[in-house]
């Protein structure tokens, strides 16, 4: 069992690495405006979009214009989506008669999908009509992912001293050249594997083996099951590729209609890893230094493999208390699908939280403490591949901090890619770094301090982790959750909405300001004393910076939550 599980993980990682140089090179060609095989088909369509939108693609933007374009376009997308969610009960394409959302739930849901988070305080199959799934969610899954991609590419350009580009062009090309073609192709593959794509309503299937239930002293013979279908294959592909994570069903990719078998599970893992891993290589191509890209990739890959190993060990060892009751050692199968098993569940959990996707093929609330620690660790760092576009930007921010600290140690003015790092750059990098812990820890403290707000279903260490995880997921724009939490309340809807907005747009504005400042700086000629960032040694320094600054910031939370729970489990206690 152990060998088979390890083999599954290794095979998936090998395929992931094999994709990186090809997809990374393709994305570099797209964002440099070079010719691709899609030009003949998509070129005229893109030009039509520019004309209809009044966009002049040859014009470049400064950082403030780019930021305003991001904020204005996202605000314009929010309004109709919010309206549809409120009124979906009165709108067409609602065969199951789903009523409109309450204003606080609609607000949270619209903001959640707008920010590429897809945190769901409702159950997918019973909370949203087909119209909402298509017009609201799938639309925002493309545009929010494209927004992140555009910001990430603009940041790379500024860091390298190039013009930031035009947001509307980057947004359009992200959708037309990257997200849309791949999503269509994989939607067809998922459709062939049994994922539904339909506008029909709920159907009723007769059970082959009826069973009896008893509730409140009443016995009932169950002979049929309701099956919900909808436009789900098209949603599933962009859900993973765009690092969105919002599910058509309440249990997300654990549902057999979203993720029917091990083959689709492999495809979904590769899809959610494809963009953030390949963007690191894209950075190397744009910097004319592929070695730099591979060093950064290797740095994050080593951290990722280590975290996968910890999560897999935790799931393979299982729960000591349960194993003691059974009298044998067994992997953890609580909250998991037997068609995937412990290895693929651990890998999926690590990948989905590392990439800020948020889709799940097992319930994170049921993970062992070690695997739960890994998922929370990923959300708190945001750089173990990271979000769509923003992930590479955060990695480069840690690179900037590492260069600054190294420069201080050797007594030189730090510089990166031929640009000096001065007070403004370090201040902006610090803001980007500090926003995350503040918007996680402050609302967590409020929720835990005021009786009745937290809504956690577990006492003790695990209950603390449930609350912290919800805010960390919102702040990181991930969207997964420890779903034992009672989060369908006005407090959770409104407080996480604020965290979602701050976690998305405050760093984006700061990233663009940092990129704009570096882009304006005069280049500094390279000398024999210039610190090289494309070496394995400096990759190790960057990894150390990530672990020291990122992990230690949240260590008290880790210690009071999953680490304490793990120690208690080893001692045979359940709290």
UniProtKB/Swiss-Prot annotation:
GO biological process: potassium ion transmembrane transport
Record has Transmembrane as a keyword: yes
Cellular location(s): Cell inner membrane
Residue ranges of coiled coil: none
Quaternary structure and partners: The system is composed of three essential subunits: KdpA, KdpB and KdpC.
Its biological purpose: Part of the high-affinity ATP-driven potassium transport (or Kdp) system, which catalyzes the hydrolysis of ATP coupled with the electrogenic transport of potassium into the cytoplasm. This subunit binds the periplasmic potassium ions and delivers the ions to the membrane domain of KdpB through an intramembrane tunnel.
Protein name: Potassium-transporting ATPase potassium-binding subunit
